[in-house]
Amino acid sequence: MKIVLRVEGLRQNYGGVQALRGVSFELQAGECVALIGPNGAGKSTCFACLAGQQKALAGSLVWRGYDLQQSTVEMRTRLGVARTFQVAQVFEALTVLQNLQLVLQASRGVSMRDLLAECLLDEARHWLFQAGLSDLGEEMLRSPAARLSYGGKKRLELAMAMAGLPDASQGLMLLDEPAAGLAPEERTDMMERVKRMAHLGATVLYTEHNMDAVFGVADRVLVLIDGQLVAQGSPQEVAANQEVRERYLGQTFSLSKEPVRA
């Protein structure tokens, strides 16, 4: 498989405290990779540097040949980089459809009048379907997003992230705890959709504290502790890594979940 993201020697400091200490890894096209570690390990900082919300102190970030260190958030979106957050970031005062329309307007460079065209309304509904919101009635689609459940807002944010990319099947999806706060059935469905995104060609990097959503879903696992990448490999390799068990997973951890199929 083709390597599409190279992260080399990534460093970031906060007031003299090293948040990232020379982190290096590569991602291949169509991979679904989990980034795990305890709170404060540097996962969110790594995501912020990749997404352009922060500029790394040192190191290189190369996505499909483009230097992300020299790219703004807007440029990264055009290059196919999207991020979601642990707490869903949606415009609650706007309707569900308006949230999607706003993203489409920004990413497609079209006027608000053009957004009312049936083809773009159909595209908005397409992304809602991909995120698992196809069962929303017309009344709910035209209601404020604040009326959605927590899980509904997480799905809407995922739909917005996919809709904002030039080609979601070629994009880099940075998903910060996509299943956090969801009921077990919702969590399973969400992670199946995350896996499906990679199956369709997107490169997915996500964080999670729920180990079922990690070891039952990811193709590979990266382990970040105290700002350093201490292990990476298949779920089986990482679960068997003695340092990871001692410093994070615990000695009694075992792989008990069947892998999620896309």
Regions found by a protein language model. Give the residues of each.
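Glycine-rich phosphate-binding loops of nucleotide-dependent enzymes
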Residues: 2-6, 10-262
